[in-house]
Amino acid sequence: AIHTALSYPETFSSCIALSSALVLYEIAKTGKRKNNVMPEAMVRDVFGNPNELLRSDKNPEILYKRLKEEKKRIPGIYLAVGTEDYLYENNQVFRNFLEKEEADFFYEEGPGMHNCAFWNEYLPKGLEWALK
């Protein structure tokens, strides 16, 4: 959701990002996903060269900065993640980036894992935020 909204800001005014797969941070460090969840060949097919990943348009930070530099409207972001989600740390990194940029975003976290129970609780909250 984040990548799509930042790639097409003329189409999306905001996005709801629940347990976002912001795995680029771990891939850039190690060249692979934690626990080898994704074969290295697939990582390269999806993300390209891990050494260039953080500087590429696969990185939502790059997309955000590009929109800001071009003085284009930047979609708002609702970001929510469970504190037991295996993607929690990656979401923290992106949240910290958004804070530093003083972005239009709303962040929530709470008990939960990467599953429908968490998403079912936070999707209505995200919709309420997006429809304000």
Where are the regions that the model predicts?
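Non-catalytic cap/lid and distal C-terminal segments of serine-dependent acyl enzymes
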Residues: 1-132
